[in-house]
């Protein structure tokens, strides 16, 4: 520490290197106003000891307004203390001085690109991982031994087709990529012509580290809470008070998300698992940190005309640097549903862009409100000319059918049954599956609708995302009987008419779900989610380390079904206009007078012509 670094340029101590990168961040990553606000915020809250101004853990937590109920303060302080030492991990944990805290804000708000050449998201996520991890080669070696044993046990009867938690097992050359692990550090040192510092110990191998499960759980709870936050919105206004019920809700969702990392069988999260799960299922998990730490760059009600030490300065009316937020802003979620609430909405924003979700969702259909029928679904959803989110919740069906309807479902499916993704004795028997459908809903003819942005996902009891593949384009269907399969779903191709007729002429046709698919029957009573690890359908199989090689099929009884429209008031207004037009047309048809003088006879003639249906409602608008 403090030793000179050999280089052609004048030698710089480690302290000088740290100071230099902080100065460059200050000069190139912030506007003068932002830097002024940061200076003011730091001075206003800093403690002083031996002439050193710094921020304590208590100060940081109080400024960010971190809720005590989540117990996440120590985790955020650990992250800041590590990032404050950037680009010198050997100096961590750092005291949060002015320069250290400036580096923390620069990195967590992703403003370092103006100084460093390396700007990739994966590189940024690696620094986030480092800031959360503990380094213990003994723990890592123990993990690797367990994974190797698992791989041997699984490979014995099956050859080399599966590696269990292979994403965590060290593959060839993994230990040889240490330079790549430190790309952001290297970029920082290279920007100061101090690359030799890397050779003198400024490197840390992420493969000898692990994020403790408890710390990660607390952080995910906070990320669920702050997902909708704006840079100028305080956490106290976003969540003025955390009830016990809301805290329990956050903990439940955080545990679901952590199950994606396989923490049930591990003491923590390794880098390879972290990188795999984040990149495939939770790409926007850490987005909330950006606006949270941008709070350092906004000083409210600060009078720029006044300066310290200038008592002669005339008193002027205070002018805020940032205009105060609107008193009545659009709510994040206008009204919660039976499935969708603020916490589930935040979970969705971890893989769907929050700008399409927060303050943008409109409830279109609820089975328990509008009725569990294809007709009600069609009436409420089909006129929405923007993307939609379908959510279905239900309980696992018993292995042996207990009712006629359950038996009919079993008879409809192929005789070979894959195991469910959960065991019958699991504490959580409830599933939540869903889909993001970018296209407008319509009745399916000869082919499915939708495009490559269509996404299948699972929100409980684990978190998983199944993106569209290019192998097949059978994304979404809505089919009424006698079309096969009758119902709605995603990922299963529509059979040709000839195949459908020939198979159904003498007996009920067998429904063969796609390799990765979700199907709801036409009574909206049962749902089936199928996952075949080999893939080959319209959606890619799971990439989660714990389940990527597994086949399963979840059959469950639907308890709640919801569809939410993504879009603003303009889309909702278009839907209202369409509904009003259809009502007027239906009423006009009901009032048609054919001149017979007999109103009942008129209706019978209209029914025979197919213009109105037997329940006296208007006919279909096509």
From Swiss-Prot:
Q: Major place of localization?
A: cytoplasm
* Domain of life, per lineage: Eukaryota
Region ranges (Disordered)? 146-179, 308-328
Domain TLDc, first and last residues per copy: 338-567
The task this protein performs is described as:
May be involved in a process influencing telomere capping.
Output the PANTHER family linked to this UniProt entry.
Answer: NUCLEOLAR PROTEIN 7/ESTROGEN RECEPTOR COACTIVATOR-RELATED (PTHR23354), RESTRICTION OF TELOMERE CAPPING PROTEIN 5 (PTHR23354:SF130)
The protein, known as: Restriction of telomere capping protein 5
What is the gene called? Answer: rtc5
């Amino acid at each position: 520490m403090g030793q000179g670094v050999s280089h052609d340029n004048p030698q710089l101590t480690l302290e000088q290197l740290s100071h230099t990168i902080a100065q460059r961040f200050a000069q190139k990553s912030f506007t003068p106003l932002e830097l002024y606000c940061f200076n003011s915020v730091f001075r206003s809250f800093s403690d002083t000891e031996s002439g050193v101004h710094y921020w304590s853990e208590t100060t940081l937590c109080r400024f960010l307004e971190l809720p005590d109920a989540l117990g996440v303060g120590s985790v955020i302080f650990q992250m800041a203390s590590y990032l404050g030492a950037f680009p010198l991990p050997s100096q961590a944990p750092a005291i949060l001085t002015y320069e250290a805290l400036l580096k923390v804000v620069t990195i967590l708000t992703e403003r370092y690109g103006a100084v460093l050449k390396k700007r990739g998201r994966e590189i940024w996520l690696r620094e986030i991982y480092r800031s959360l991890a503990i380094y213990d080669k003994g723990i890592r070696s123990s993990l690797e031994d367990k994974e190797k044993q698992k791989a041997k046990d699984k490979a014995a009867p099956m050859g080399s087709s599966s590696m269990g938690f292979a994403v965590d097992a060290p593959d060839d050359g993994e230990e040889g990529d240490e330079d790549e692990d430190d790309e952001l550090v290297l970029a920082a040192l290279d920007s100061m012509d101090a690359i030799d510092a890397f050779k003198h110990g400024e490197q840390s191998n992420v493969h000898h580290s692990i994020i403790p499960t408890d710390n990660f759980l607390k952080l995910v709870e906070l990320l669920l809470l702050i997902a909708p936050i704006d840079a100028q919105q305080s956490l106290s206004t976003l969540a003025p008070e955390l009830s016990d019920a809301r805290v329990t809700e956050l903990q439940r969702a955080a545990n679901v998300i952590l199950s994606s990392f396989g923490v049930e069988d591990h003491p923590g999260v390794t880098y390879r698992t972290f990188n795999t799960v984040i990149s495939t299922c939770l790409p926007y998990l850490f987005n909330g940190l950006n606006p949270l730490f941008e709070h350092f760059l906004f000083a409210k009600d600060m009078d720029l005309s006044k300066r310290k030490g200038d008592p002669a300065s005339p008193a002027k009316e205070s002018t805020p640097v940032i205009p105060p937020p609107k008193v009545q802003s659009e709510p994040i979620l206008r009204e919660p549903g039976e499935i969708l609430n603020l916490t589930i909405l935040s979970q969705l924003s971890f893989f769907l862009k929050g700008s399409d979700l927060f303050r943008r969702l409109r409830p279109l259909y609820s089975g328990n409100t509008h009725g569990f029928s294809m007709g009600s679904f069609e009436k409420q959803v089909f006129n929405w000319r923007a993307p939609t989110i379908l959510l279905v919740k239900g309980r696992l069906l018993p292995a042996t059918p207990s009712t006629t309807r359950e038996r009919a479902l079993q008879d409809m499916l192929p005789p070979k049954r894959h195991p469910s993704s959960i065991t019958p004795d699991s504490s959580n028997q409830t599933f939540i599956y869903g889909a993001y459908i970018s296209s407008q809903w319509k009745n399916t003819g000869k082919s499915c609708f939708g495009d490559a942005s269509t996404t299948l996902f699972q929100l409980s009891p684990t978190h998983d995302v199944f993106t569209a593949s290019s192998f097949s384009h059978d994304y979404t269907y809505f089919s009424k009987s006698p079309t096969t399969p009758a119902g709605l779903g995603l990922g299963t191709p529509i059979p040709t008419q000839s195949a459908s007729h020939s198979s159904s002429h003498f007996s009920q046709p067998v429904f063969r779900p796609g390799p990765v698919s979700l199907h709801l029957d036409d009574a909206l009573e049962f749902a089936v989610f199928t996952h075949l690890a080999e893939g080959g359908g319209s959606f890619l199989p799971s990439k989660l380390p714990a389940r990527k090689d597994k086949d399963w099929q979840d059959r469950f009884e639907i308890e709640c079904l919801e569809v939410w429209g993504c879009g603003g008031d303009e889309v909702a207004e278009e839907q209202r206009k369409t509904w009003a037009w259809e009502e007027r047309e239906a009423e006009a048809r009901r009032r048609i007078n054919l001149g017979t003088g007999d109103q009942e006879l008129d209706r019978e003639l209209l029914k025979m012509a197919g213009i109105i249906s037997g329940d006296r409602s208007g006919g279909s608008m096509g």
